[in-house]
Every structure is written in C-alpha cells, then in structure tokens.
Amino acid sequence: MLLDYFSQLPYPIIFCVPEPIFVMVTVVIPARMASSRFPGKPLVPIIGLPMVEHVRRRALMAAGVDQVAVATCDAAIMQAVLAYGGNAVMTKPSHERCTDRVQEAMLQLPGEIVAMVNGDEPLLVPDAITQVITPLLEHHELDVVNLLSPLETEADYFNANIVKAVCDQYGSVIYLTRAPIPFFRYRTSVPVYRQTGIMAFRNSFLSRFSMLAETPLEKTESIDMLRVLEHSIRICGVVANYPTLGVDQPSDIALIENVLGRDPLQRDLLKQTLVSAL
C-alpha cells in the first residue's frame, strides 16, 4: 500500500540510508623507566624481547583496534619501540598517573575510544582489550571501563601492591583500594577482584579527567581511578575472560617466563608475538 502511494507521486523519492558510524579505537601503552619498585622495568628482556614490546605486539592483535602507540617520557623507551617499527609519543616527565600520561598522548593521536594497557602486562591476552572497548561501543552513556580479574590467593588479598575492587550488583565499581576488601565477617561466596591495568575511555572524557583536580582518596591510596569515583562518575567493571598477571617487582619476571612456557594459550601468543610483523 505504501509503495503504491510513492509510485504515484509526480517526483522521485530518494531514501537516504545512513552510513555506518566508524569509531576509531586507539590503544595507548604508558611506560616509564622510573618505577620505584622496579627501575627500568619496560625494557627488561623477556624471552629476548623488551617487556613493553611484548605488550605492544599483543595489543596489535586485539579485534577492533585501529592503532597502538607507546606513551613515554624516556628517550630509551621511545628509541626501543621505534627500533622495532612501533609508534611512540613523548610526554611530560611530571605525570604521576598513567591516565594523565595517556591523555597527553591522545593530544597527538586520533581516536574516539582509547584503551589504556600498562606497559607491565606482558601476558596481555588481546581479547582483554576487546572486552573493555565493547561496552563503550555498545553503550553511549558509558565513559570508563576497567578490566577486573579474580584474586586467586590469600597472599594477593593482603598484598598492598595489588589494588582490590568491589562492584555493585550491576557491575559498576564501588571502590578501589590497596586494603583487603571486602572483609569476610561471615563466609560467603562474594567474589574478590583485583584491578588490572587494562581500561578504556572515551577520548572526550579523558580531556575532562585531566582538568579534574586530584582527589583526597586518590592521593591517599595512589590510585588514579579513585579520582573518577570521587567525582561520582561511573566505572563499568568487566571481569576478564582470562587471568592477568602484571610485573610489579624483579622476581615477577621468573613467574612470567614460567607461565609463557607452560600455559598453552600463552605459548601460542608468545609464538605470534615473536614472529609478528613490525
């Protein structure tokens, strides 16, 4: 009936089909040499390749990613990345928070969605990046997504170097802390998560974030995402499909290499990493 009506009109009708919206996704890897617990960490060799280069090559494997860049304030890191054919941008040395370094890097890079992957995540599973960017692509009201990983040992629960996360029943992060939370007054099945260094943001949000003053809890705990929570901005927590293990101190390198040798998925990713095109 409707088509008959249009066919009788004295002038042609042109139906405009909107073009699909392309959203560029950029991965930024913040890395610096001046780690208090592990100086020079990004360039420490793992199976013959600098740690940051493991992370960069794995990030390039993630579905939905358009480009990857390392953000650093150290010429040695920049030269190493460029020598392997990667992209790197220089940032100010004054940044104390990874997120602020990523925001400055994005002033030099295109992209509507920004995934941040810390340079000390050599066991990065590319799917983890896809996990954090997907909610931003599907839910326009979200600005921040953080990948969480279940805590596996009691030692990790009490380790102040591991940031714990608690979420509400809808998956939003309630709080992040170095303290052991939740406190188990009674034995329950409540999961305990650790924050990972894998997050995603809208680039427009990063600009706003950089203009927000550091907050009391952020300074107290030295956790940059507390600035987001203290300004009542929602952080969507996504539980990792695969366990993550970052490098915090020199002794962690042996653990990383052990996992690379015995875990089937990690062995396969290592092969791809070592032979990946630059």
Spans of features found by a protein language model:
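N-terminal glycine-rich phosphate-binding loop and ensuing alpha1 helix
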Residues: 24-72
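Short phosphate-binding loop-to-helix
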Residues: 69, 75-134
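Conserved core of the sugar-phosphate nucleotidyltransferase
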Residues: 125-215
